């Protein structure tokens, strides 16, 4: 579970990602965002991933403020676009990411990027 912060711009960071990371980081980001939502009280039956790596520094950072959550979500969706561009297909975690985005305002505390 990592976040490769290659640029402050999440789109540029996705484009700079190597092939291996452009594939792997989509799933890891979706897992982190799902974990953060569950840690902040989401327990609905709408499908997102279960909790994992709850004490990992990247997961803790993502859940600290909505701006952190939003950066990771934007980066993960940019990685999805990059994945489609490079490989001509859609990543299975993309729909999870959109669902995380729909839930964010209700569960993630407001705050600036840290």
Regions found by a protein language model. Name each.
Residues 1-86, 91:
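An N-terminal structural lobe/cap that precedes and organizes the functional/catalytic core
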Residues 91-95, 112-114:
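Secondary-structure junction/capping motif
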Residues 95-102:
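A glycine-rich phosphate-binding loop feature that marks nucleotide/adenosyl-phosphate handling sites
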Residues 102-114:
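Aromatic-residue-lined binding/catalytic grooves and analogous aromatic/hydrophobic interfacial grooves
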């Amino acid at each position: 579970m990592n976040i490769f912060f290659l640029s402050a711009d999440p789109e540029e960071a996705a484009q700079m990602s190597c092939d291996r990371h452009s594939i792997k980081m989509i799933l890891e980001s979706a897992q982190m965002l799902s974990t953060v939502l569950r840690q902040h009280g989401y327990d609905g039956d709408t499908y997102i991933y279960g909790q994992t790596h709850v004490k990992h520094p990247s997961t803790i950072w993502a859940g600290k403020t909505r701006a952190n959550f939003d950066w990771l979500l934007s980066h993960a969706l940019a990685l999805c676009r990059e994945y489609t561009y490079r490989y001509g297909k859609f990543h299975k975690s993309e729909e999870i990411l959109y669902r995380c985005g729909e839930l964010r305002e209700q569960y993630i505390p407001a705050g600036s990027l840290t």
